[in-house]
């Protein structure tokens, strides 16, 4: 007796592709066309089962009500100074998009400068990137619709917040860098393409160009400053040096933390910017990352991982740039990772380190590199910073699993450099004193110690009875640091849950070594690390397999899907958000080609063999043992996700329902929800965020029989 009547879905058994002598069947390749009537009918049929299932979850209403109540707290960014004014972002609580405010002084009256909520009825137009001119008098800002990566750039005169007529289109993954004369701005665009470009298409993004837009002119007159016709995957972002004299061009080939660095001395362009710039190729290989910090004349300070996987600061003199002449300003730390650096008050450097997944903030001397001060911080993450070379003050924002945020302000002109609390936010209804956060280090399959944070109510019995929510990512050198999540705290508070975040390999938690330990031929380490996290939680009595949910998004969606295939017995519930599921074809759609630096590419025989072993789409099989079924699975994606296109999740759910869902022993649901007017996640309006987490936690509660605790 089938527990679920899944839709009858056509299988094209003739759809076969050959890879290096292997014939791979791809019966749902027709779902790769997002515009076909068949695909639309498939999505509609899936949503028709999923939406009622989610709406009938007994706690969905309670969860959504509580989420709406607790998420309604003020959310601030750090203040930042532009020209003679201060700006900051602020959301009163439940506004769909945060609003940009301006003040003439820190004590002055705050006025709305840009409110994205006025740009759509449903909050689906979001601010994506912005840049002020050097004098703070002009403002460029990017808008994206429905969660797409495509951006339209518009301009304003800051005085009186006056709209200007300039509009830039065909923009994606862009820099925004004004020349210091305020005449114009560098940005990136893509060539015209056939068909639509609204975020629902899947066509590949190649041949990005660097252009210069002169304020007050039409985009058709913009000046092409750099292009790479022989290297279609290259992407080059520009920035201006602090003194405005040099344009620095960072060229990236994929997602690896390595870039070429070219520069142009604008004093060598006597007629201004009129065409391809006279680029000097300072670094012309992909052997390290070079992140500009500041310069004193021709001596440039960079943060680099060249021969230093945890990063260090070096000085390169542009007049004598040979690598043998580079000077170390701040050496690499043996264990801690240097995450970012900023120059402030002309001669100070602010350095942010990651020490066992917790941030450390320091002040150093620009001339000698010497440590001057370590700023006091609780255990958690620095999530905001402002302060540039010409500023004499800094703001920084701290958060943790149990603290929504404190913003500190430090006046660097004072003798005593004491940061003061500038703003502190509390959330009514969740008392941090009732909960505890611990960090443990558990052994993975190969013995490597992996850090994991665990958050739970104080005083719980470790008897294996608690529902647990385990989150992971594990890729692209991205570190998953403590963050404040109301939706997860509701799970802890009202569902009696344990929250766990595993800092598995592939991330940047311990520098480039940690990243390389979870990519390419080592990708299986990510899955092993995550499965060992689950086993640790079970062994220590936090939870049991039937009470354990795993969750991840994007590369983390791949993670949880691969783990469900490899160890269906270990988890009770899996929620995969916008996951990469077809590892043989991902590089063919939108920006997927950039991820080959982490995954490899099936066009190469050796890579194909790695990918085929774990690709979620190609490893779905009915468990052999009678008493093992797949966990309850909910896939989430959206029609305007042009980062990880929805076809990944569509093909995966069709495969799951066909191979597993038709079996008598599979009583757990295998469902997908496809949202509309939404994308990969950036800029998602609050209303949609609340609906999404209500769906997720209602699904968990229904599938794992979790009662709501008032």
Curated annotation (Swiss-Prot):
The modification N6-acetyllysine is found at residue 157. GO terms for cellular component: cytoplasm; cytosol; extracellular region; nucleus. The keyword Cytoplasm applies. InterPro entries: AB_hydrolase_fold, Pept_S9_AS, Pept_S9A_N, Peptidase_S9_cat, Peptidase_S9A, Prolyl_oligopep/macrocyclase. It holds the Pfam family Peptidase_S9_N. One of its GO terms (molecular function) is serine-type endopeptidase activity. Gene3D superfamilies: alpha/beta hydrolase (3.40.50.1820), Prolyl oligopeptidase, N-terminal domain (2.130.10.120). SUPFAM superfamilies: alpha/beta-Hydrolases, Peptidase/esterase 'gauge' domain. The keyword NADP does not apply. It is found in: Cytoplasm. Coiled coil: none annotated. It catalyses: Hydrolysis of Pro-|-Xaa >> Ala-|-Xaa in oligopeptides. The modification N-acetylmethionine is found at residue 1. Its EC number is 3.4.21.26. The active site is at residues 554, 641, 680. It is an enzyme of class 3 (hydrolase). Cleaves peptide bonds on the C-terminal side of prolyl residues within peptides that are up to approximately 30 amino acids long. Belongs to the peptidase S9A family. This is Prolyl endopeptidase. It comes from Mus musculus (Mouse).
């Amino acid at each position: 007796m089938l527990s679920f009547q899944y839709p009858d879905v056509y299988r094209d058994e003739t759809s076969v592709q050959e890879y290096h002598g292997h014939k791979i069947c791809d019966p749902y390749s027709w779902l790769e066309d997002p515009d076909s009537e068949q695909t639309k009918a498939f999505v509609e049929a899936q949503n028709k089962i999923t939406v009622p299932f989610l709406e009938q979850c007994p706690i969905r209403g309670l969860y959504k009500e509580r989420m709406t109540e607790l998420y309604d707290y003020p959310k601030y960014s750090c203040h930042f100074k532009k020209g003679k004014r201060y700006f900051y972002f602020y959301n009163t609580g439940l506004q769909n998009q945060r609003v940009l405010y301006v003040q003439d002084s820190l004590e002055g009256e705050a006025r709305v400068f840009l409110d994205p909520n006025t740009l759509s009825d449903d909050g689906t137009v979001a601010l994506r990137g912005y840049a002020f001119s050097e004098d703070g008098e002009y403002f460029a800002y990017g808008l994206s619709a429905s969660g797409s990566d495509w951006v339209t750039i518009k301009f304003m005169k800051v005085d009186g917040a006056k709209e200007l007529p300039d509009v830039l289109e065909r923009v994606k993954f862009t820099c925004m860098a004004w020349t210091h004369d305020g005449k114009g701005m560098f940005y990136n665009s893509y060539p015209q393409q056939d068909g639509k470009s609204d975020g629902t298409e899947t066509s590949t993004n190649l041949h990005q160009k660097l252009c210069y837009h002169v304020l007050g002119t039409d985009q058709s007159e913009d000046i092409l400053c750099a292009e790479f016709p022989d290297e279609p995957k290259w992407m080059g972002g520009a920035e201006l040096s602090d003194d405005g004299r040099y344009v620095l061009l960072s060229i990236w080939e994929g997602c690896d933390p390595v870039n070429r660095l070219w520069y142009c001395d604008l004093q060598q362009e006597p007629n201004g910017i009129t065409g391809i710039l006279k680029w000097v190729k300072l670094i012309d290989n992909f052997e390290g990352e070079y992140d500009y910090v500041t310069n004193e004349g021709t001596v440039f300070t960079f943060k680099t991982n060249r021969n230093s996987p945890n990063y260090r600061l070096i000085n390169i003199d542009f007049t004598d740039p040979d690598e043998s002449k580079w000077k170390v300003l701040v050496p690499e730390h043996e264990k801690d990772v240097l995450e970012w650096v900023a120059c402030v008050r002309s001669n100070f450097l602010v350095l942010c380190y990651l020490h066992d997944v917790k941030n450390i903030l320091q002040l150093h001397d620009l001339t000698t590199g010497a440590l001057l001060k370590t700023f006091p911080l609780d255990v958690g993450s620095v999530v905001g910073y402002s302060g540039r070379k010409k500023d004499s003050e800094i703001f920084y924002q701290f958060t943790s699993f149990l603290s929504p945020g404190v913003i500190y302000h430090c006046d660097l002109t004072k003798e005593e450099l004491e940061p003061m609390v500038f703003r502190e936010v509390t959330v009514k209804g969740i008392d941090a004193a009732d909960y505890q956060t611990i960090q443990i280090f558990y052994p993975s399959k190969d013995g490597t110690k992996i850090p994991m944070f665990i958050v739970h109510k104080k005083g719980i019995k470790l008897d294996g009875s608690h529902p647990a929510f385990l989150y992971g990512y594990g890729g692209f050198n991205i570190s998953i640091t403590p963050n404040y999540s109301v939706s997860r705290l509701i799970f802890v508070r009202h569902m009696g849950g344990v929250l766990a975040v595993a800092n598995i390999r592939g991330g940047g938690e311990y520098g480039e070594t940690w990243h390389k330990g979870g990519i390419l031929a080592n990708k299986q380490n990510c899955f092993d690390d995550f499965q060992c996290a689950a086993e640790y939680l079970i062994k220590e009595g936090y939870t049991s397999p039937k009470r354990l949910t795993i969750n991840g998004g994007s590369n983390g969606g791949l993670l949880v899907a691969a783990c469900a295939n490899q160890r269906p017995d270990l988890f009770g519930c899996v929620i995969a958000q916008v996951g990469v599921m077809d590892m043989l074809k991902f590089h063919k759609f939108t920006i997927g080609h950039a991820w080959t630096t982490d995954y490899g590419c099936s066009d190469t025989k050796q890579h194909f063999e790695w990918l085929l072993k774990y690709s979620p789409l190609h490893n779905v099989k009915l468990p052999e043992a009678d008493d093992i079924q797949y966990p309850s699975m909910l896939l989430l994606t959206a029609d305007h996700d042009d980062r990880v296109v929805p076809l990944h999740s569509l093909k995966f759910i069709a495969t799951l329902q066909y191979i597993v869902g038709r079996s008598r022993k599979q009583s757990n649901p295998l469902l997908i929800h496809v949202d509309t007017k939404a994308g990969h996640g950036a800029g998602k309006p609050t209303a949609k965020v609340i609906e999404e987490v209500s769906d997720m936690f209602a699904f968990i509660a229904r599938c794992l029989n979790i009662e709501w605790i008032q």
